[in-house]
């Protein structure tokens, strides 16, 4: 039973308290962060597509809208609407990037990784090379995640650094005197008259 628990135990770097820590860069943690961001990226898109289909009166076709590049077209309202929803998805994912990653130096890497995985998924689903319109949309979406994600994560880093500087780790220790310190102070007071007498004898 003990051995089974040992295998079922979650590694320390994969615990929720460690996933969102900024000072850990273990491969397992980075891999989990990529998976979480990809899940939120597609989940947000599904919610946006569902709301848009209900409001605009379109038949809901999640698989085609998510994993196909053929719907991305800038020459009609239908294709433009889907493109704008993808850009809105990237804008919302800036928040998830800030919370999950939280490091400005890694925002660029994670933004590119999300869209690289999306390209692989789309290519495997359609078995065709995407169009120029789709690639242009991915570039715009990547720029949103890179620039806004870098700005928000840097703001978070500066905020954490500012508040850490205001907290004194030694606060609360002032005024506390240990018994050993009391004994040393008492011995110093006892030795001071002797030193004064020695000075008087020398004079």
UniProtKB/Swiss-Prot annotation:
Subcellular compartments: Golgi apparatus membrane
One GO CC annotation: Golgi membrane
UniProt crosslink position (Glycyl lysine isopeptide (Lys-Gly) (interchain with G-Cter in ubiquitin)): 15
Alphabetized InterPro entries for the sequence: Integral_membrane_SYS1-rel (IPR019185)
GO terms classed as biological process: Golgi to endosome transport; Golgi to plasma membrane protein transport; protein localization to Golgi apparatus
Main location: Golgi
Topological domain ranges for the Cytoplasmic compartment: 1-29, 102-105, 155-203
Membrane-traversing stretches: 30-52, 79-101, 106-125, 132-154
Disulfide-linked positions: none
Keywords: Golgi apparatus, Isopeptide bond, Membrane, Phosphoprotein, Protein transport, Transmembrane, Transmembrane helix, Transport, Ubl conjugation
Lineage: superkingdom: Eukaryota
Positions in the Lumenal compartment: 53-78, 126-131
Miscellaneous section: Present with 238 molecules/cell in log phase SD medium.
Family of the protein in this entry: Belongs to the SYS1 family.
Role according to the record: Necessary for the targeting of ARL3 to the Golgi. Involved in protein trafficking. May serve as a receptor for acetylated ARL3.
Record's protein name: Protein SYS1
